[in-house]
Swiss-Prot record:
Organism encoding this protein: Saccharomyces cerevisiae (strain ATCC 204508 / S288c) (Baker's yeast)
Purpose: Non-catalytic subunit of the V1 complex of vacuolar(H+)-ATPase (V-ATPase), a multisubunit enzyme composed of a peripheral complex (V1) that hydrolyzes ATP and a membrane integral complex (V0) that translocates protons. V-ATPase is responsible for acidifying and maintaining the pH of intracellular compartments.
Sites of the Glycyl lysine isopeptide (Lys-Gly) (interchain with G-Cter in ubiquitin) crosslink: 14, 508
Name this protein carries in UniProt: V-type proton ATPase subunit B
Biased composition (Basic and acidic residues): 500-511
Entry-linked Gene3D superfamilies: 3.40.50.12240
Family, per entry: Belongs to the ATPase alpha/beta chains family.
Amino acid sequence: MVLSDKELFAINKKAVEQGFNVKPRLNYNTVSGVNGPLVILEKVKFPRYNEIVNLTLPDGTVRQGQVLEIRGDRAIVQVFEGTSGIDVKKTTVEFTGESLRIPVSEDMLGRIFDGSGRPIDNGPKVFAEDYLDINGSPINPYARIYPEEMISTGVSAIDTMNSIARGQKIPIFSASGLPHNEIAAQICRQAGLVRPTKDVHDGHEENFSIVFAAMGVNLETARFFKQDFEENGSLERTSLFLNLANDPTIERIITPRLALTTAEYLAYQTERHVLTILTDMSSYADALREVSAAREEVPGRRGYPGYMYTDLSTIYERAGRVEGRNGSITQIPILTMPNDDITHPIPDLTGYITEGQIFVDRQLHNKGIYPPINVLPSLSRLMKSAIGEGMTRKDHGDVSNQLYAKYAIGKDAAAMKAVVGEEALSIEDKLSLEFLEKFEKTFITQGAYEDRTVFESLDQAWSLLRIYPKEMLNRISPKILDEFYDRARDDADEDEEDPDTRSSGKKKDASQEESLI
């Protein structure tokens, strides 16, 4: 069979196009300028958005970058390792034709990586079971499953009043100088799945894992996280990504995406329940602003790019559950509010995308309360689907509502006391003040290494609510009140047994032992 010239041309054209698609490997020496973290290249053929490029410096050093923008035959590349030392005339750029992918494997658990996904724990390279695009695969909205069932953190203020459902995304709003890093480390140590019975709570199940990504942290904070995870054994089920403050700012843009790609592999291919903690998202937003300024884009609020809402959603929306997969991704991003301003663009836009917030309060911190979580501005929008009979306990919802109501009333009573004095307060106001003090000192206050199950937290909540007579607990249904109020009283009476009675009981037991001898 003889092919015509036209047919041969078509076959050759198709082969060339396929060759470019598979592995073009085009090299250029056409760098025309460097602007901040960006490199501008001229006369580029077939550039692609998000394509990975390798830049070879005159000294032989190779750095990775990503095509950020294409204007005709001009390509703008952001360099992950920074642009210092790049010579415009002597730097060679290679276009790979591929997007940024990360090698993933179950062996990533127990390992520590830098912000670009390279191991920094003196261990071997990860033996890849798959290579995944760090931007993730789009999830069909119809295939998403509503987040249900609870993830326990071991922190009473979260588990009892702001319960987190598997597949939920709920940020922690903090500020400079507050112990959000300690809270994050405590959650990593204690987090697990909740069993529906009081006497069985296995927080370290084989199908529960944690992916932790830190962006822009200093050396002291990075050392704290590594030591804490290693000493408490939580590193075995954790994959840790660390982008330090002295690392290139641009690297912070890919660090959370590397972490989430790892989480997606563990959740959807190995069917684990994955808790992903990202800190600090403010550093990520500042990196976005730096790139936007280098590209000379029109700035939005406070200099941040106008597309920051869309960009943040590409991170937060990767949490969830998918039909046909038993795993889930639960996200807890942590951000520091500049000047404690909750209306700042970063917390403001984050609040629009996520499903609630956990608020770390400076006033509680100044009182010496740890963790200083203020439950009044905190909210978990998916809490109702994570609690109740069969998941935690049937009294959970009513107890949470009653604690919120009494704590708010206690705050009002404290404000009134500051104006009129304690003598002018009613008996109910004095009860509210007593509840306020005990709530903050015994319920919210918790040791950094104190792990409370959700059932222990609920029992402690009932012991606080017993300050009030039954008729004043109007947020709890009569049936729940009859079942749990007296039970809480009986438990408290047993704990407050007379010490003289206990000592006489011990003497009686000792005399019985002597008579037996």
